[in-house]
Amino acid sequence: MKYQLTATEARVIGCLLEKQVTTPEQYPLSVNAVTLACNQKSNREPVLNLSEHDVQDHLDALVKRHYLRTVSGFGNRVTKYEQRFCNSEFGDLKFSSAEVAIVTTLLLRGAQTPGELRSRASRMHEFSDMQEVEQTLENLASREDGPFVMRLPREPGKRESRFMHLFSGDVETLVNVAEAVSPVEDESLAARVDALETEVAELKQRLDSLLAHLGE
């Protein structure tokens, strides 16, 4: 998997994707608007408290990696940002509106069931029924240029399996971790996965910092 986003990078991109669809009149977003979106209490898991400085650092890094681009001029006093993560003119990653809604909601809230995704992604795409949600997830999991999502083992006592995005790690690692924790009944699988994602993100940031230092 060529995408390796940290947890905060996933939040930033998810916010830009969300606002592009739900509030197009306010898009692209300034660093202040991105910060407010990242720290938003609704439709976010976990709720963050990022500083504008932190968000600016992540925006700069994502611009360098060509996931975002800056927009200035034409009466804009401040630099604004728009996503180039998917469906951009020169990018290879193309998603349908249903796929954008699912991917965005997973980036913003982590692993969720198809039922939760249908409800939470409804502002971005009106799914006709659960079959459309499940078909969209299947498409994202089986695409030749993916996979972009995976189904987690069902938690004990739960009726539905959850799905998670794969933009922050490779399939094999996540599958092995999911299989390792699936028999454990006394701990929440969600907490274990969230902790893993945070650890991977922190390790990647430390590696990026080390590589940058070595390159000086």
From Swiss-Prot:
Which Gene3D superfamilies would you find in this protein's record? Answer: Winged helix-like DNA-binding domain superfamily/Winged helix DNA-binding domain (1.10.10.10)
Tell me the domain of life.
Bacteria
Under InterPro entries, the record lists: DUF480, WH-like_DNA-bd_sf, WH_DNA-bd_sf
Q: Which SUPFAM superfamilies match?
A: Winged helix' DNA-binding domain (SSF46785)
Can you tell me which family this protein belongs to?
Belongs to the UPF0502 family.
UniProt-listed NCBIfam families: PRK11239.1
Name recorded for this polypeptide: UPF0502 protein Ent638_1581
